[in-house]
Each structure stands twice: as C-alpha cells, then as structure tokens.
C-alpha cells in the first residue's frame, strides 16, 4: 500500500498558517489589507490582550456577497486574480487567497457582512470548518471577529512574546498602514484605550505627526521625484531626529509596506555625512510604479519584493533626499530636559493650531486642522534583545502615539509671561509667524511641512525661525555671529541677537577640508610635482596582486604607482594639491584602504581618501586660536556646501536660543 497521501484540508491549512499567521500582528495585517482592498474609508481595529484573546476589524467597504461567503474561508479563493497574467499586474494588497483560511484554522472566527441593497449575513468558522451561516443585521461593510488565537496549536501559543511586545508589533503594523493610506480613517483600540486615530484627511504628514509627535512633524521635509518608470513621494526628518535602529524607515511600493536592503541603503546614502555611524533617519517614502516592474509574490507575508531597474530607483531616492537638505538650515537645537507643566499657555495664544497644507487641492477644498494637544509624560515600552520589555522614562518608542508636543505649563508659575508681555518684539515676531502660517495653509504650492517647520516652537528667538528653513543664498545658511571666545581650546563660542552658538572647531575645519579634497580628488589634472628622489614602497606578494589589479583606480586619485622590480614599487610624482609634508603618509593610507577592502569602488575610494586627509589636516582639540582665526574659520564654513555636519555625521554647530538660556538660569519657569 502506498505511503503518500493527500493531507486533510484542516491540517494543510494549519501548515500554511505557520507562514501566514506568525503572531497576532499577522492577523491584524491581513484583515487590515482586506479592508483596504474592499475600498473602506473608515476602519476600526479593536484588540484585547494584545490580540491573543480577540481581534476585531470593522470597515465600511464593499462587503461580501452572500453567495461568496462559503468560499472566503477556502484556501486560494480570492476575488483579486482571475488568470495567470493578473499575477504580473497586482495593485491590491492581498491576492493569494490564504489569509482567512489560515486564520480560521488556528482561531474562532465570526464574520458579519453586508453589501449595497442587500441583507446582512453572518458566518461562524472554527478549526477551518463553517459551523453556522445565517442572515443577520449588519451595516454595509465587513465586521470580522477573531477569538482565541492559536487555541488549537498550543506550541505556537507558548512562544507568543509578552503582551507589550505583541501590542507593539500590532501598533507598528497599523501605524505604517495609516501612513500609506492617509485618506482612510483608521482607529486602533487596545483594551478600550485608543492607541491611534487618524482623520482621513489624505495628508501623510498629519498621520506622521500623530505617530511621531509634533516635534518631529515640524522637522519633516517633503520629497518628490520622477523617472520614466518610478515616482517617489514622501517625507524625511532632519538628521537631528535620528534613531539608533532602522525601524523608523518606512518604504512602500504602490501603498504596500515592504522591506528592501537596497532601498534602505539608498536612504542612508541620501543622508550621507549628515548622520553618524549607527544612527538612522525617520522617513516615509512611497514608490509608485507599474506593477510589472515589481514581483510581490516572493513570500506569503508579502513583505519581500523583487524590483526591476533597482539601480535607477536607488539613484532617484539618493538624489531627492540630498536635494531636500542641500540648502536647508540644519543647526540642531540644544536638547534641554524640560517637561512643561499644566494649565498655563506658553505663548500669547490659548492653543496653537497647526494646519498641514495639502500637497494638492482636494476636490472639496475642505479646511482641515491639526490641534496640538497635551502629551502625556509616561514611561515608554522598549524591547531588549530577548524580546522582554524594559520600561524607560525618557526613551522614545514608535509604538506610542503622541498627538503633539505639549505647549502648556502651570498657571502657578510666574515670571515667564510677565517677561514676554513686556517684550513687544517677541509678540511682533509671533504675529508674523502666525500670519505666515495662515498664508501657508491657504496656499496650494505643494510644499507642506517645510513651509512652517520650526515656526511658533517652544523656543524664544531662534535662527531657524528668522532665517527660514531653506535659504535662497546658501552662504546665509550659517547665521552671522560675533565671536565671544573659546572653551578648552576645542569649542568656539559665538552669539547674535537670537542666542548662543557652540562650534566644534575640529569638525568645522574637517568639513571645509573634506569638501576641498573631495573636489580635488575628483578633478582630472596634469598638474603634478616631480620628486627628485622617488618614494619607495615594499609589498608582499599577495599585496602586489591586489595593487596590480587596482592601478587604474589609484591613478584616478592621483597616485602613479610603478613596479620597480621584486616587491618594490615607486612613486615619482604626486598632484600639486597634496600637502607636501604628508605625501608619503597619504599614499600609504590610500594603498592601505585598497588592501583592506580587497575591492575598489572609485567613488568610495575618493570619499574615504578625502575624509582621511581632512581629518588629519584639521585643527585638533586643545588648540587655542586667536579671535581672527576663529572668525576666518566661521567665514570659511559659511562657504561650505554642507556646513552643519562633519564628514562622519557629527554636528558642527549647536544653537542655544535666548529663551533656552533663560530656562537654564530659572529666569523663566
């Protein structure tokens, strides 16, 4: 008798569920995608005990026809594909027809649905079998309740992480879906507490403000770009809001959240020299393309995709992020540990309302506003390497929604309002800001957040407010300031009417020299300095093999290396712009870079060499400067292409506004 037999449907579904339904967040993702595909404009997600006890998703989409209800829980039953060719033109989020079958095999599922001009129906499924199917009262759309997840697979239930971890993963999925579909009102409720609620205005930056808070939202920069095959749209946060992991990078293709190593790399390349090693940006990028250019049928979770013309897309993302920050003021503000008190308005108006301008006019041109509300000061959840939850008072968590940053302090405080009431210039400035915000909200030039970022912030005078966030004259990106002195022979202290500045002198000169060497290395020049006595270098046999392979690349950075016999090589000339006293050391370092990498990208080699040379030739710490030398250094920095970070991504200038200094000395409360 044969040993091979076809598996029972219930067993096959449980096996399939192992990939599709890994945890409660997988269920939320699949049901949310179904609701979006059904054309819903309002979706509510309610979970109890982080989805382990129950998950309920209610939408106002098209609903399911009565005759289709018997099929929706069958494997590979779907309304989204009909023939082979459809697999290459997928625009829906779901298409495999596996989700409901997999979910119903490991949970108890009740589904109510109603279409236009039809009576409602209810179906109950347990262990993959339909136990009840009857008419029922239901609103248009679908209401699906998933209970007792993994009740019949105890091994899977055993390995569910803590409730905090699972809730965090659910919130993460919903947050990303909300960002990619801002036109849908999405609410997430956990054990009766609202975790997220979007207004469906169609503005992604409003959703990001709801998720990441107003402080980040003020510093979002809009990006947009096209090629013949791709269109990208999104928001990138200023480098000062960088995080310690890649979790805050959100990439979507045709509205689908995906993970892709090359696109992550493109985003980091766009932030090149603006972020230090180990820091990652907050950003949202949606890529629109013909579905034929992307294969989403790689894995049942549909997170992995394969792209055509990936290099073209890579370059588009890099260039648009670089353009976004090219002429922008990126002086980070000092981060004071300041928590506002309740019931007292910091500014002269009762409650700041910030309205995000739509990138394009909506059809009804209905005015939407986003109100800043009081944020809660509470511990955030943080997950360690063992998936255990660690409570930290001051850590940031993407899973915790912050409607806005608080602008409110205690009525009983004194001194601050009295000071401000006497300051007519302050009120004049605030009025100008409000008028500018109003003009921004009423206009439709498509620039969104960048038109008002940093306006009406909880700082006193701030150069970012006065100069604007995008300078028409690149030389004015660094404000004019008076040199006051130097601290520890390392930091230059300067001031102007808006506050105090600290400048890292080594980082400043490193940026200046980096741009000089980078440009020189990239030039093709015949201007060389001949050596009376050639420099001689000795290499082992294996090193010789690498060097011989990359002789042309060395020539492109100005090093003419000639084999002199045996293990010896000579250099008889060098570019005139090489620092004369360091020629031999520079050449050694260049060759070592090649020997370490064992492969060479000429662009990266030029970059690494420029960074290396700039670091060695720059002013070191504990080096005291004359006042005119400090002033000259700031003037040179003002001419730099990117004057705010050193080549390694560390900040060059930090700004303390006048108000922040007053807070430090308790002159204001």
From Swiss-Prot:
Keyword terms, alphabetized? DNA damage, DNA repair
The Polar residues compositionally biased stretches are 361-378
Q: Which GO terms describe its biological process?
A: mismatch repair
User: Might you report a single GO cellular component term?
Assistant: mismatch repair complex
InterPro entries from the UniProt entry: DNA_mismatch_repair_CS, DNA_mismatch_repair_MutL, DNA_mismatch_S5_2-like, HATPase_C_sf, MutL/Mlh/PMS, MutL/Mlh/Pms-like, MutL_C, MutL_C_dimsub
Output the Gene Ontology terms for molecular function: ATP binding; ATP hydrolysis activity; ATP-dependent DNA damage sensor activity; mismatched DNA binding
Describe the function of this protein: This protein is involved in the repair of mismatches in DNA. It is required for dam-dependent methyl-directed DNA mismatch repair. May act as a 'molecular matchmaker', a protein that promotes the formation of a stable complex between two or more DNA-binding proteins in an ATP-dependent manner without itself being part of a final effector complex.
Task: Specify the protein name.
Answer: DNA mismatch repair protein MutL
What is the species listed in this Swiss-Prot or TrEMBL entry? Staphylococcus aureus (strain NCTC 8325 / PS 47)
Gene designation per UniProt: mutL
